[in-house]
Amino acid sequence: MKSKKENIAEYILYLWQLEDYLRAFPEKAAESQELMDLLMMMHEEGIAEEGHLDLAKIALSEMEDLHEELLETEAPYKAAIIHIEPQLNILKSKTDCPTMSDIEACLTLLYQTMMLRLQQIEISEETNIVIHDATQLLRFLSKTYYDRNIEE
């Protein structure tokens, strides 16, 4: 499994992908102990049909906490958020959870982009710019998270 410490954003996206995979193909869980364990967790947590594992929610919460801290201490980071925020607000307004955090919106954007690319659906240049900005933001957050947790 992807390591949360290595790249927390990729870890969350990986968990989301596994959740969708196991919902679509629950019989595939028998192929590995990792998948079997995740499917069992999904059932125990009541998210067999929709929702996210506590593992993903905790990691997202950790990213959001770091995000809030960096908004207070890193002027370039705050400027990057201010730059992307209008596009994130548009994205949020088109979801069933318009009150999601900016970090969850960035992750959702990247996850949805991955799904569109798998379906070979073209993505507009305007959207690609937002994807790039969200990726840079998550990359910075993940690197900061990694740097702070490397000693553990």
Language model segments and positions:
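Long, charge-patterned amphipathic interaction tracts in eukaryotic proteins
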Residues: E34-E72
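Glycine-rich, aromatic-bearing surface loops/beta-hairpins
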Residues: N89-E152
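Short, hydrophobic/amphipathic alpha-helical patches that form generic packing surfaces
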Residues: L13-D20, D37-E44, D65, P86, ...
